[in-house]
């Protein structure tokens, strides 16, 4: 697919038309207070993986509603002192997968926590976390589950799980809470933006080709799922356009970006039909942290920079978390 979105010079000034709810901050403060009414109950069970360079823990903690959420904690073998921590959120449809697929950050000397995504994990990497909450009728996928009520919306649970995942990761004695970064690709990047706003003391965030940004633009510019799930839903629920837009505004990465407090490293791919460039730049341009940078991959689709972006992230986080 050739370039289809705005020219790069216009992308650098693009601003979302998403309208921020007046009670955005109250909504999220109340949501997290409700979640913290449940004991975190983080449990770490050592796992024998056959890997010699890392040690792995199977983690369970209480997320939204006190529901059990899984994760992996991967640390360098033999680590005895608290390590800088990277918390990672995974892409749409995937789960935490198998431990041996998560070696990058521990190999660089970091503690690495990978959160499973509730109800997902059957698309491309296995998951182990159920979503026990039902919803009103939805289009197949996750993006429209509970979409007519922000309190019932699927991503309210996921974003809350993610905040609790940071708390669970920080509770382990081999992690240094004062040196915590969050990252993720696609859906994981959108979750990263939310956590960067909802956990004010993270040191850095690295959203990679982030999903869940600039919904008014995203749901009308691309035919590719997941965003297209919203259009398919509204084909049937014709009278729900305003209610759906109102719900999505509580979960738009643009509004979380406006509350960012940490240095941020974004990435964008100019041929990305899944997370169109203008939606990523909408979040980047709104980002309010003390510093920000964006890597632009001119001829890539949703794979983005892949290992090239990981290389950039490694150098960037080495400065922020270890110097």
Q: Where on the chain are the PLM-derived regions?
A:
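C-terminal catalytic histidine-bearing segment of alpha/beta-hydrolase fold enzymes
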Residues: 281-323
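Hydrolase active-site cap/lid region
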Residues: 193-239, 296
């Amino acid at each position: 697919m050739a370039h289809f979105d705005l020219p790069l010079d216009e992308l650098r000034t693009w601003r979302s038309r998403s309208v921020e709810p007046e009670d955005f901050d109250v909504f999220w403060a109340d949501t997290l207070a409700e979640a913290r009414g449940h004991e975190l109950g983080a449990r770490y069970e050592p796992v024998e993986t056959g890997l010699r360079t890392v040690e792995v823990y199977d983690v369970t903690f209480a997320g939204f509603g006190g529901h059990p959420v899984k994760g992996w904690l991967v640390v360098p073998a033999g680590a005895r002192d608290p390590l800088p921590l990277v918390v990672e959120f995974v892409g749409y449809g995937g789960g935490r997968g198998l431990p041996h697929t998560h070696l990058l950050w521990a190999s660089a000397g970091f503690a690495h926590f990978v959160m499973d995504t509730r109800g997902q994990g059957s698309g491309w990497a296995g998951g182990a976390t159920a979503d026990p909450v039902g919803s009103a009728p939805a289009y197949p996928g996750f993006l429209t589950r509970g979409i007519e009520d922000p309190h019932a919306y699927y991503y309210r649970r996921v974003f809350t799980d993610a905040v609790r995942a940071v708390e669970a990761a920080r509770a382990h004695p081999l992690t240094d809470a004062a040196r915590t970064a969050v990252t993720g690709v696609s859906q994981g990047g959108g979750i990263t933006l939310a956590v960067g706003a909802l956990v004010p003391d993270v040191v850095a965030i690295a959203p990679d080709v982030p999903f869940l940004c600039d919904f008014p633009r995203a749901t009308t510019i691309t035919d590719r799922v997941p965003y297209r799930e919203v259009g398919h839903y509204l084909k049937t629920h014709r009278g729900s356009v305003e209610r759906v837009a109102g719900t999505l505004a509580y979960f738009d990465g643009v509004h979380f970006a406006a509350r960012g407090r940490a240095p941020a490293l974004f990435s964008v791919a100019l041929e990305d039909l899944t997370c169109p460039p203008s939606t990523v730049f909408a979040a980047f341009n709104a980002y309010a942290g003390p510093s920000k940078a964006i890597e632009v991959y001119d001829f890539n689709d949703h794979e983005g920079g892949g290992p090239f972006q990981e290389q950039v992230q490694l150098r960037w986080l080495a400065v922020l978390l270890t110097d």
